[in-house]
Amino acid sequence: MVQVWYMDTEETDQRLEHHRNPPAYLELDDLYQKTGVEYFKINADEYQSDNTLTELRAKRGYTYDDEITCSEKCLPDYANKLKAFFTEHLHTDEEIRLILEGSGYFDVRDNEDNWLRIKVVKGDLIIIPAGIYHRFTLDTNNFIRTRRYFVGEPVWAPHNRPADEMDCRKSYIKHQSENFVQFNKV
């Protein structure tokens, strides 16, 4: 089950947990209200026939998917890719990830610009909304295999911060000010 907490401000090894002292955890409902990030539990061993995933794909129009493995052995240009993933950025489309194996962290900004760390493991599916500042890193296991979902042809174009003038960012801020009440939650 996914865990979420407020991060400390240490700039040591990004793969560590980085809890505040004392630790400050968030419930999934609070994560959604603060960030619009959605979470679903999926049977990773039988994801092709998982009803929740099938429903999500139909309702959200996810017509393309692929798989990516992040490890030193499997990812070409590993060090530079991890650096790019951990650079704070946003996307014009939502980012949908199903964890098939391994673990890692998605960090997202809340409405007060604090970092929230989301630990993802096998069976976790998260949807990072378009326009939210975020980043990704592996944990100390240094391995994750994920299924990525897209509406149409895949576009993974990061827009590094600052990108506040982009339409997707303005739309995100509007939804955030409304606690994501009228957002896409399925």
Curated annotation (Swiss-Prot):
It comes from the Eukaryota. It catalyses: 1,2-dihydroxy-5-(methylsulfanyl)pent-1-en-3-one + O2 = 4-methylsulfanyl-2-oxobutanoate + formate + 2 H(+); 1,2-dihydroxy-5-(methylsulfanyl)pent-1-en-3-one + O2 = 3-(methylsulfanyl)propanoate + CO + formate + 2 H(+). GO terms for molecular function: acireductone dioxygenase (Ni2+-requiring) activity; acireductone dioxygenase [iron(II)-requiring] activity; iron ion binding; nickel cation binding; oxidoreductase activity. Keywords: Amino-acid biosynthesis, Cytoplasm, Dioxygenase, Iron, Metal-binding, Methionine biosynthesis, Nickel, Nucleus, Oxidoreductase. Pathway: Amino-acid biosynthesis; L-methionine biosynthesis via salvage pathway; L-methionine from S-methyl-5-thio-alpha-D-ribose 1-phosphate: step 5/6. Pfam families: ARD (PF03079). Ni(2+) binds at H89, H91, E95, H134. The keyword Amino-acid biosynthesis applies. Disruption phenotype: Viable and fertile. Females display reduced fecundity under restricted dietary conditions of 10% yeast. Fecundity can be rescued by supplementing their diet with methionine. Its EC number is 1.13.11.54, 1.13.11.53. Fe(2+) binds at H89, H91, E95, H134. GO terms for cellular component: cytoplasm; nucleus; plasma membrane. Its main location: cytoplasm. Its cofactor is Fe(2+); Ni(2+). Binds either 1 Fe or Ni cation per monomer. Iron-binding promotes an acireductone dioxygenase reaction producing 2-keto-4-methylthiobutyrate, while nickel-binding promotes an acireductone dioxygenase reaction producing 3-(methylsulfanyl)propanoate. It is found in: Cytoplasm; Nucleus. It is an enzyme of class 1 (oxidoreductase). One of its GO terms (biological process) is L-methionine salvage from methylthioadenosine. Belongs to the acireductone dioxygenase (ARD) family. Catalyzes 2 different reactions between oxygen and the acireductone 1,2-dihydroxy-3-keto-5-methylthiopentene (DHK-MTPene) depending upon the metal bound in the active site. Fe-containing acireductone dioxygenase (Fe-ARD) produces formate and 2-keto-4-methylthiobutyrate (KMTB), the alpha-ketoacid precursor of methionine in the methionine recycle pathway. Ni-containing acireductone dioxygenase (Ni-ARD) produces methylthiopropionate, carbon monoxide and formate, and does not lie on the methionine recycle pathway. This is Acireductone dioxygenase. It comes from Drosophila melanogaster. The gene is Adi1.
